[in-house]
């Protein structure tokens, strides 16, 4: 089967890391990029050097129409209006919408006017169907043209919640994600009228914040709808975050049982390569560049009793999430081709 041809709209953090993951996996073929705010020489520089993930392992050059990466030409467009991007001329059928701006079905659908066939939003969406690989990707149908890969935190929490719910019954749960700072935060205290705390210096503070990631699990696992909610603590680290899920189970269970069950789920079936498992004494930087959605930390969790437990699972919120964007495109293109 032909490798799906991909276009990326928005060459920010996720756009560039999706690009790197596309090359690392070989499962999709990026043929075009659109970003009105980045000219090609600067795009080449930003792709080549990365403060978190290091230098790009390959060759990057520019030519009159875009970039040449590992000897392959990639068209570069600079359109502000998604409807004006000539994706079809570059052969791009699957578009990664990673600007963070066009996150509704209506807005993201504009890409279809330029010759694209499907749009994958690399963020939660108010109305587009959300898919989490290993959890509900089999619900995808070929008539869906705009879909969301949910958020990095939902991709970490959902596989964990699925294993607990499938095996022990999840009555209810509260999640806290201890989350690295992101591009929306500030380097020094600055105006942030909609989120006063969010305007404070990212590298100096632990900042409580809201997140819809836990509630979104109810959209990808309908039986958990209304059973999970959560919050975020933004902390002064550049990358890698960790989910803390405190939950009640229907069945009586020991923490050892939970460890065995999660370990088994990580080694075979739908969650292999998506859910990880470790008993090592790791810290956050040990997981930079880890491609799992969720890495269960067996030593970090605790149980109060047979029904009340705290589970801890790590995720590289840039790399792991971006790999799932690539996986989702590879998966839906396979379904589309059948």
Swiss-Prot record:
Compartments reported by the entry: Cytoplasm
Gene Ontology MF, one: NADP binding
Binding site for NAD(+): 13-14, 35, 80, 317
Cystines in this chain: none
Alphabetical keyword list: Cytoplasm, Glycolysis, NAD, Oxidoreductase
Swiss-Prot/TrEMBL catalytic activity: D-glyceraldehyde 3-phosphate + phosphate + NAD(+) = (2R)-3-phospho-glyceroyl phosphate + NADH + H(+)
Pfam families with a match to the protein in the record: Gp_dh_C, Gp_dh_N
Assembly description: Homotetramer.
Protein name: Glyceraldehyde-3-phosphate dehydrogenase
Organism annotation: Aspergillus oryzae (strain ATCC 42149 / RIB 40)
């Amino acid at each position: 089967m032909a490798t799906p041809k991909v276009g990326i709209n928005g060459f920010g953090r996720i756009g560039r890391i999706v690009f790197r993951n596309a090359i690392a996996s070989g499962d999709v073929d990026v043929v075009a990029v659109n970003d009105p705010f980045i000219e090609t020489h600067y795009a080449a520089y930003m792709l080549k050097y990365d403060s978190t993930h290091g230098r790009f392992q390959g060759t990057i050059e520019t030519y009159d129409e875009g970039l040449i990466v590992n000897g392959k030409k990639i068209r570069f467009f600079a359109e502000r209006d998604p409807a004006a991007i000539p994706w079809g001329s570059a052969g791009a059928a699957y578009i990664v919408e990673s600007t963070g701006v066009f996150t509704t079905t209506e807005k993201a659908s504009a890409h279809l006017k330029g010759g694209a066939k499907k749009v994958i939003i690399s963020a939660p969406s108010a109305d587009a169907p959300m898919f989490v690989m290993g959890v509900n990707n089999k619900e995808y149908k070929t008539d869906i043209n705009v879909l969301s890969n949910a958020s990095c935190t939902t991709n970490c929490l959902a596989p964990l919640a699925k294993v607990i719910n499938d095996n022990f019954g999840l009555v209810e749960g509260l999640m806290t994600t201890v989350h690295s700072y992101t591009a929306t935060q500030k380097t020094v205290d600055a105006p942030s009228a909609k989120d006063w705390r969010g305007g404070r210096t990212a590298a100096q503070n632990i900042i409580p914040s809201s997140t819809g990631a836990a509630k979104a699990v109810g959209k990808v696992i309908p039986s958990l709808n209304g059973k999970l909610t959560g919050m975020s603590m933004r902390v002064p680290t550049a990358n890698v975050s960790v989910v803390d899920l405190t939950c009640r189970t229907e069945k009586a269970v020991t923490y050892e049982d939970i460890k065995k069950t999660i370990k088994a789920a990580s080694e075979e079936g739908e969650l292999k390569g998506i859910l990880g498992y470790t008993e090592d004494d790791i810290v956050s930087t040990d997981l930079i560049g880890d491609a799992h959605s969720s890495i269960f930390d067996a030593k970090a969790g605790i149980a109060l009793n047979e029904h009340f437990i705290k589970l801890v699972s790590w995720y590289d919120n840039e790399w792991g999430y971006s790999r799932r964007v690539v996986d989702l495109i590879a998966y839906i293109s396979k379904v589309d081709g059948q």
